[in-house]
Design a protein with these regions (language model features):
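Bacterial N-terminal signal peptides
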Residues: 1-8
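Structured extracytoplasmic
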Residues: 12-159, 166-173, 177-195, 203-206, ...
Length: 275
């Protein structure tokens, strides 16, 4: 996010229950949990690529509590008749944002980092610190703090906290920000800041924990002005593409789970705030 002309506050208590700093129950080790959820995330990433869904994005600037600018776009993520992934914009009124400009990094963050995945392919890029155990709604979770080991020029990373379900070993919630945050007092037009965000996931088809809701409400400190930003991103209408499609991981076909019925609620998950 660029204006016209740090580590997030991880102590922020966003879990339902108190944080228990004790180690996992033996014989399970922290490293085993990390390897399990990284493998599950790779499986999840492959599976989500076989689903259609609707993505509803709102990016707002606020003056006090009054919205004074908004970018809003609704997109259906589909497959064409040849099975290629496509995005079809179904609603996109004229943006009224004036105090910030949406950059390509913002669009990339919305697409790739708000629904953050940390697979076994990316795990070596990050420092992963076990924090403890915490109840998240009806779920027992392991909590980890995540930060990139190094910042490679031109690359973007997630930095923050994740909650991993202690039964399925899948990430069920993330809280953090995209880094690096680019400040440039001499050339404000080159600044690129983004807000801290929370993404909640819910179980789809009785198997995979897919992102369903992201919210951010944060003040960005540009060189020339402080701008309060709000993001609201909804992911809805998940449907498995094609009855004959197969999802394979390490040579094995993954289970399809139970097919979700239209209007059926997800079968479990963390609870986003009331809208």
């Amino acid at each position: 996010m660029a204006a016209c002309l740090a580590v997030p506050a991880l102590a922020d208590d966003r879990g339902e229950g108190p944080l228990d700093p004790s180690q996992p129950q033996p014989p399970l080790t922290v490293n085993e949990i990390i390897q399990k959820f990284a493998a599950k995330e790779k499986e999840f990433k492959l599976a989500r690529a076989q689903y259609t869904y609707t993505q509803d994005v709102r990016v707002q600037t606020l003056d006090g509590n009054t919205v004074d600018g908004e970018y809003h776009q609704v997109t259906d993520v589909l497959f064409d008749d040849k099975g290629h992934r496509i995005e079809q914009v179904t609603f996109a009124p004229q943006s009224t944002l004036e105090r910030v400009v949406m950059t390509q990094s913002d669009y990339d963050d919305i697409r790739n980092r708000l629904p953050f995945v940390l697979t076994s392919d990316e795990i070596d890029k990050y420092q992963i610190l076990y924090v403890g155990k915490q109840r998240e709604d009806e779920l027992g979770t392991y909590v980890f703090d995540i930060a990139p080991k190094e910042i490679v020029h031109g690359e973007r990373y997630f930095q923050g906290r994740i909650w991993v379900d202690d039964h399925d070993f899948q990430i069920v919630k993330t809280y953090g920000e995209t880094v690096p945050q680019v400040h440039n007092a001499k050339h404000p037009e080159k600044e690129n800041l983004s807000p801290k965000f929370t993404t909640w996931r819910e179980q789809i088809d009785g198997q995979y924990w897919f992102p369903t809701y992201t919210r951010a409400d944060d003040t960005l400190h540009f060189a020339e002005d402080d701008v309060r930003m709000r993001y609201i991103v909804k992911y809805t209408n998940y449907k498995r593409y094609g009855a004959e499609s197969k999802i394979t991981y390490e040579g094995q076909e993954l289970s399809k789970g139970k097919e979700a019925q239209p209007g059926q609620k997800p079968q479990g998950g963390t609870t986003p705030p009331k809208q």
